[in-house]
Amino acid sequence: MDEGILARLITFTEDVVLCIVLNDGRKMITNGKKILAGKIEGELASFILSASKEFLEDKKVGVKKFKDYDIYFERIDINKFLKSIGGEFVKNTITVSELLELIKKEDVIIVDTRSPREFKEETLPGAINIPLFLDDEHALIGKTYKQESREKAIEIATDIVEKSLKRILNEAKKLDRDKLIVVFCARGGMRSQTMALILQLLGFKVKRLIGGFKAFKHAVDK
């Protein structure tokens, strides 16, 4: 399962259906009521949305045909999915509910690794901002991803991180080493993973928020 799908799945709290157009690899995630993620549109999207309902009710896996398309459907049990993810992806991670409980019980430093613009718009209560990418850098990476390729965007991001290490390290020096640090980004993806690695190498106790800011918003806005 690719990182993009993983990043989306870990933001949900209820079972969803993963749908893949086998002809071209396009993906969509739905809860049977609306499209939660994916770029499929038109009649095909409407068919997938309607067909996905039976996989939430009865079937778990199956393939359906719509015109010239073969679509794979798989119900994802979110609770089992989160428990089953292993290895480095979930090492030293924390869920939203665990973070909320942790805040009540002990001192914790919450670090928002998103861009300054994202941080100013909205963040977690009490969070401080140590951005992996500054506003113009974040915009450049996003533009490159959309207009050129994922590989080129990653190449640019890697170069930026290398040049930004001094800035990040200077900010990290201000953190209290006796406190647990929880880092997050938009979806719990590359930015928070990278920042967590940097802080761990510096000897800090670090946990990464699963699902990032989106998961937190979803939980508190229910």
UniProtKB/Swiss-Prot annotation:
Protein name: Uncharacterized protein MJ0052
UniProt domain Rhodanese: residue ranges: 104-221
Annotated organism of origin: Methanocaldococcus jannaschii (strain ATCC 43067 / DSM 2661 / JAL-1 / JCM 10045 / NBRC 100440)
GO-annotated biological processes: tRNA wobble uridine modification
Pfam family, any one: Rhodanese
InterPro entries assigned: Arch_SelU_Nterm, Rhodanese-like_dom, Rhodanese-like_dom_sf, SelU
SUPFAM superfamilies: Rhodanese/Cell cycle control phosphatase (SSF52821)
GO molecular function terms noted in the UniProt entry: tRNA 2-selenouridine synthase activity
